[in-house]
Design a protein with these regions (language model features):
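Catalytic cores of eukaryotic secretory-pathway lumenal/extracellular enzymes that build
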Residues: 1-257
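Terminal low-complexity segments of carbohydrate-biosynthetic enzymes
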Residues: 104-105, 123, 127-139, 143-153, ...
């Protein structure tokens, strides 16, 4: 009963993905593209959605999955159970646990949910997975704010009504689909059981951005579309989306924001969401209380080139984020006890993460190393 569509993006030198055995299978539709023709994952997913042929359901997957026996029955039982609970259009989506490609065995088998991580400086909201608390006690899927593009199960009409924007590239795809699906009347859930595993590694396999030197151009266009669709950072909606890749009419963007505890215009997040409590978020008596419920966490990674750190006797790094006028918005230094772990690696870049609450977006950062012998060394700066 399965119809399978694969967007096969490959190179003549590839030896690990021969699909010849499936080309004559009437249930398998292979869209054959040279790797040089590919424009990324969202483009590929959009291509697949154009092949929808009236099937009752759609399950969107990445490559590299392993399934439990009876996964389809389990998934449909979850779907129908949610409908019996009053959710007309359930969308069951998840980051799923990993498996070891060499052994084929699961790395872990606990079901995951997604939580808010941070707003990127370019706009998109980022999420992270974690184990669903007390999942063994659950009898059904749990509500979600967010969407995973590598496992998404819904009615077949999802392929027509919530199509992937082929001009999206990578980051930003999932948050826009979460909002768009919600406005089309879909209710988002995470499965409370592990139905499959995904291979996340593949370090030796080239990605699209490894082969295509223009990927930064794709990224820039994608980020702009995310910001303008969701109004992130005060961007104004641009209806060149022609509504095909825009919102539905069953709910509004603001209704999603109230449901999820996210406000895109100023990158605001409610504490209820930061505490990883299930949606929907609490209602507020008036607009003032609603506005006061938002905090503005800023999370950022500064990459410092190791070659800039030539001394071997550092005692601290001053580490600050500044506004456009050069005033400190936040300062949290790297102290001496943190330095051994930070500097012991061999990577060319040293990653310094900071997270703090701010309404004003930082404009620049400063890392200023302090050496026992030389005192304050040359400062290292960057624009955000």
């Amino acid at each position: 009963n399965l119809s399978v569509c694969v967007c096969w993006q490959h190179d003549d030198k590839d030896e690990w993905d021969d699909l010849d055995d499936y080309k004559d299978n009437l249930n398998v539709n292979i869209l054959d593209y040279k790797a040089s023709e590919s424009k990324g994952a969202c483009w590929a997913r959009h291509k697949i959605q154009q092949e929808y042929n009236g099937e009752d359901f759609t399950l969107q997957l990445d490559s590299h999955h392993r399934f439990i026996k009876g996964w389809d029955t389990e998934l449909k039982n979850m779907y129908y159970g949610l409908q019996l609970d009053g959710y007309e259009k359930p969308l069951i989506t998840a980051y799923i646990p990993g498996y070891d490609d060499k052994t084929g065995k699961p790395i872990d088998s606990e079901p995951w949910r997604l939580y808010y991580n941070y707003f990127g400086h370019d706009g998109p909201l980022h999420t992270m997975p974690e184990t669903i608390p007390d999942y063994k006690k659950l009898t059904g899927p749990v509500p979600s704010r967010f969407f995973s593009a590598h496992w998404a199960f819904a009615d077949g009409d999802f392929s027509k009504n919530v199509q992937h924007d082929p001009k999206m590239y990578f980051h930003g795809e999932e948050i826009t689909l979460a909002v768009r699906a919600f406005t089309h009347g879909y209710d988002l859930f995470h499965p409370h059981k592990t139905l499959a595993w995904h291979h996340y590694g593949r370090k030796d396999n080239p990605k699209h951005w490894d082969d295509d030197t223009t990927y930064n151009d794709y990224n820039s266009v994608s980020y702009e579309r995310v910001r303008k669709l969701l109004g992130i950072g005060g961007e104004k909606f641009n209806n060149d989306f022609n509504y095909k890749y825009g919102f539905g009419t069953e709910r509004t963007l603001e209704e999603y924001e109230r449901y999820a505890g996210i406000r895109f215009s100023d990158k605001g997040v409610q504490q209820y969401t930061l505490d990883r409590k299930y949606p929907s978020n609490p209602e507020y008596k008036n607009k003032k209380l609603y506005n006061q419920s938002f905090t503005h966490p800023f999370k950022y990674c500064v990459n410092v080139y190791r070659e800039h750190l030539k001394e071997n006797d550092y005692i601290c790094f001053a580490f600050a984020f500044k506004d456009k006028d050069g005033n400190d918005l936040h300062r949290q230094d790297v102290v001496e006890s943190e330095l051994p772990d930070l500097l012991k690696g061999t990577d060319d870049w040293i990653k310094l993460w900071r997270e703090f609450d701010t309404i004003d977006k930082p404009h620049s950062w400063l890392v200023w190393p302090n050496s026992k012998k030389k005192g304050w060394c040359d400062p290292i700066t960057g624009i955000i």
